[in-house]
Amino acid sequence: VLAALFVVASILFAGCFSDSGPPGYYGTIIVPRAQEFRWSDGGLPQTFDPAFAAAPPDTDAVRALFEGLTDYDPVTLAAVPGVATRWESSPDARVWTFYLREDAKWSNGENVTAADFVRSWQRTLKIGPLAPHTDLLSNIEGSGGNPPPPKTEKQSKPIPIFGAEALSDHVLRVRLHQSDAAFPALVAHPVFRPVKVLDANTTNRLEPDHLVSNGAFQLSGKEGDRVLLERAKTYWDGASVSLQRVSFIGSSDAEDALAAYRTGDVDAVTNAAFEPLALKLLAGYRDFRRSTFGALTYYSFNASRAPFDDVRVRQALAIAIDRERVSQDHLGGATEPAGKFFPDEMSGEKPVVNEDELIEQDIERARALLSDAGFPDGAGFPTIRLLINRNDQQRIVAQAIAAMWRSVLGINTEVVIKNWDEYELAVKAGDYDVVRRGMVMQTTDELTNLRMLFERETVPVIANSIPSLAKPGEVVKPEAPVVTTENEALKELRAVPIYFASSFALVKPYVNGFGGNVLDAPSLKRTRINTGWTERQP
């Protein structure tokens, strides 16, 4: 087997030490003379519709073609102006007002208006579950089909049912069910980007042949295994966009993408499923990049049944896990151990969880907690039923953690493996003691991420921090900082973070501004080809 792996490696890396490129870089470097970016992004975009885009490369194409109220700074992930030049909120952060720029245009020359956003969001809600990220709109009043508030005698007209309202062509007001101080960051997500539709009931996918967009780029066509974008002439900030052309280049698999990069046919490779051996061999190259990706694997306890209703038991099981060993030894170093629920990069300006609050292995304390809970050395503790979906990686992780619980606490574990449909039914029925869950964070908005991580019915601490849905006009006290809620969640440990995924990329040294981040969302608006790049000798 090892011999076969090295044969594969020799094929993958053939020619990488040739004189065609500077030392330390993978493969050939041919500096382009034009502002064209050739991107192998895990395949070709299958949709250009913000409502239907689920993941890269679709979401990357949508971010290039459409602009929302805000965008992310690709480095800090702070919300920066997009179509909106500024925004303000009510004191309780439940009502947000966005002021749109007057020079924002669609690619057909028409003005982008606040009504475009209202219609687009209503359309996404109308599409429903077929739109993969509809749930991100759930905090907007009226998004869940709530009945309209009764009309009072003092009101000249009823309060609009839907919480997004165009006060004028260039002023948009959004009412939320609950306070969200980071709402401007949430609306940077592709699902909030407007589309040119005349009717909010239009649920068909946007057709590429007649696509009208408002972003820095517009769709120019498809040539063989390439989807082509060109800089939009109508974009309000076109002068700051360097790239004239972007080519999404298809590849059959990671080896195909790697071969194209090695020969200089593409400028960047992202979202390729590299094998562990390939990752180890690539790690030494200067153009290889690795970053933490906001995809969390965690274990959730069924705290409605004994003995998992005892926080001491949950804490003991949590700190008996050696996350570093799981990531390094069992997953080949391709993941990052998670001592909390959100990566550091999500915290931004806010305080982060203190070092002493991180979940780390502590064998002696784990044993003491289990003994205090009435199970010294695991005596009398029932066999844990650990439910996972059928997946080789998750099986390896589950078996490793089960072995740690056995060696540290003397507790036996039955790993229950089910196909996805059966797994989901078991989760809904609560037919488990511990269950493997996963979440890909779509935003830096921690309130939204907490809503995705925890269900009110199963996590009282989180439930107490999320008020019941308020009616329009009701006064709601401002929320406590979300990081406090994360701290409380770490104390209660109804769920236990295990590891974050990592994202990997190869980027030619002459490509500037194409940086990775925890959302795996690089900005093509900031990307530039340094046509005069040369290798500087040390």
Where are these regions (language model features)?
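A structural "hinge/loop" feature
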Residues: T28, D41-V62, V83, E110, ...
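Extracytoplasmic/peripheral linker and loop segments enriched in polar/acidic and small residues
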Residues: I30, E165, S327, I359-E360, ...
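Aromatic- and charge-enriched surface segment that lines or borders ligand/interaction sites
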Residues: T85-L136, R173, A260, P307
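Extracellular/periplasmic solute-recognition and catalytic clefts
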Residues: S220-L228, S247-R305, Q328
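Gly/Pro-rich hinge or "lid" segments in bacterial periplasmic/extracellular proteins
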Residues: P147-I159, E165, D169-V171, L176-R245, ...
